[in-house]
Amino acid sequence: MRRFYRGIFIVWVALRYGLDELVLTSFQKPWLRVVARIVSIGRNLDAPRGQRLREALERLGPIFVKFGQVLSTRRDLLPPDIADELAFLQDRVPPFPSAVAIATIERAFRRPVGDVFVQFDETPIASASIAQVHFATIRTDEGEVREVAVKVLRPSMRGVIEKDLALMAMMAGWVEKLSPDGKRLKPREVVGEFDKYLHDELDLVREAANAAQLRRNMASLELVLIPEMFWDFCHPEVIVMERMNGVPIAQLDRLRAAGVDIPKLARDGVTIFFTQVFRDGFFHADMHPGNIQVSLAPETFGRYISLDFGIIGTLTESDKEYLAQNFVAFFRRDYKRVAELHLESGWVPEGTRIDELEGAIRTVCEPYFDRPLKEISLGMVLMRLFQTSRRFHVEIQPQLVLLQKTLLNIEGLGRQLDPELDLWHTAKPFLEKWMVDQIGPKKLFQQLKAEAPRYAKLLPELPRLLHDFLENRPADHRRELLELLAAQKRTNRLLQTIIYGGIGFVLGLLAMQLLVRVRLF
C-alpha cells in the first residue's frame, strides 16, 4: 500500500511541475496527447523545463536528487539545457539523530560505543542522503590515540532505495513502451546504471577500499593527502578513517591569507587528475569543491586533501587505447579516423554512414582550433562530442561519461583558482608519456608478450574451423572463427609494426653514422 501511495505522490509531483510535457507530448497515440493538454490546464509553466525537473526531483527527496545528479552526467542522452540544470542539484539532507548513529555503530561492532571509541562526538559535522560523519578518537593496537572521522550509513536506506528503484524501473518501462523519444533516452538503462551506483555507495567498505587504493597510488606524488582507513573499525554500515584538518578549497581568502600559492594549487589539481587517469586508470570521480580541502599543516602545507570516495572511475587498457588514438586523430584533425574509432568500438548502430558521422564530428571540433590552446576545454570538447553522438544513437560507455564529467569539474575548479591556467601546458607531459606508453614500441612488445600464449593455443585450431565453416556449418563456429581471424590479424599487425620499427631504427643508426663520417672527411 505504501508503494501505491508513493507512486501516486510521484505522479502528482510530475504533473504539478509540468514534467508530463517532457513525456506525454511525444506519445504517438492521439488520446495521450489529449491527456497532455488536459493536465496542463491552469498551471504556470513559465519556468524552463530543466528548472522544473530539478525542483521536482528536490521535492521527491534525496534518492531522486541522487538520480538527477547521476542523470546530469549523461550528456550523451539529455538535451544540454536539462543536463546543465540538473548539475545544480545539491545533496542537502538534515542529519539523523545521534542516538540512531550510536545504535548503528553498536550493532555493527556488537559492543557499546564507549568500548569502540575513546571519545565520540555526538554532533555530526556533515550529513548527506546516504550517510553522515562524526568526529571521534580511537586507541590503536599499538596504544596510540588517533583522531578519526566516523562515517555512518543512514538507517533504513536500503529499504527506501529498493522501493524507489522499483518504482523508477516500472515508470521507465512505461516510458519506453509508450514514447518513441523516451525509448531513445534509454530510461531502463539509466535506471539500471543508477541502481548499481546506489548499491555501490551503500557499501561503505567499498568506499574504504577505494580510498586505500587511491592512497597507495598517490603516495609518491606528494601533492595530495588521502585519509588512512582503520580496517579493524570498518563495516558495511560504518567506516573509520583518519581525521583530516584542512581549509575548504572554496575559501580562497583564507588560503591566500595563509600564504598558499593559488596558481600552483590550480596546476597541482590538474596534475593530480591526469596522474590518476593516465598513469593509474583509477580516478576520484566526485572532485567538486565540497570534497576538497587544502592542508595548512607545516609538513604538508599547500597539499590537496581529498574526501568522499564513493564514486570512483576506472579505465581499462582498451579505454586508454581508444582515448589515445582519439587524441592523436583530434590533434591531426583527422575526423574520419575519429569516426572510424567510434565504428570500430561497436558503439555505433549498423548502417551508420561514416561520412555523416565524420561531418558532425568536424562541426564540433574544428572551431576549437582557432582558439589559443589555453582556452580549449577538453571537457567541453568531449561533452560536445557526446551531444553529437545522440544524433547517431552512439552508445557512450559510462566510464568515459564519468571521465568527461570529472574533467569538467577539474577544469572549472582550476580556472576558478587561476583564470590564466593553461590546462594543456600542465597536461602536456602526461599526454606525451601516455601516448608513448599506449602506442609506442614498448606497448607493442608488452601486448605481444601478453597475448602470445593465447594466440599460440588458438591459431592451430584455425584450419579445422575454416574447414568446418566451408562445409556449411557456420552457425556453430562462426563466432570462434572470426575471433581467431581477428587474433591472427592483430598478431600480424604487431609483428609488422615491430619489424618495421626495428628496420627503421637500424636504418636510422646507419644514416647517422654515415652523416658523421661524411662530416669527418
Swiss-Prot record:
Keyword match Transferase: yes
One cellular component (GO) term of this entry: plasma membrane
Topology of the protein relative to the lipid bilayer: Single-pass membrane protein
Residues of the active site: 286 (proton acceptor)
Pathway, per record: Cofactor biosynthesis; ubiquinone biosynthesis [regulation]
Residues of the Protein kinase domain: 119-497
TM annotation in the entry: 496-516
Superkingdom of the source species: Bacteria
Any GO molecular function: protein kinase activity
Homology family: Belongs to the ABC1 family. UbiB subfamily.
UniProt-listed NCBIfam families: PRK04750.1 (NF003404), UbiB (TIGR01982)
Record function comment: Is probably a protein kinase regulator of UbiI activity which is involved in aerobic coenzyme Q (ubiquinone) biosynthesis.
Protein name as it appears in the record: Probable protein kinase UbiB
Organism of derivation: Variovorax paradoxus (strain S110)
